[in-house]
Amino acid sequence: ADPPIHIASL
């Protein structure tokens, strides 16, 4: 399970 990182953070 990946941490809830926002797509904009990528």
Swiss-Prot record:
Q: Its Enzyme Commission number?
A: 3.2.1.117
Q: Which domain of life is it from?
A: Eukaryota
Question: What catalytic activity does the UniProt entry give for this protein?
Answer: (R)-amygdalin + H2O = (R)-prunasin + D-glucose
Q: Which residues cross the membrane?
A: none
Cite the record's note on assembly.
Monomer.
- Record PTM: Glycosylated.
Query: In its keyword annotation, does this UniProt entry include Glycoprotein?
Result: yes
Going by the record, the broad EC class of this enzyme is: hydrolase
What's in the keyword line of the UniProt record?
A: Glycoprotein, Glycosidase, Hydrolase
User: What's this protein's name?
Assistant: Amygdalin beta-glucosidase 2
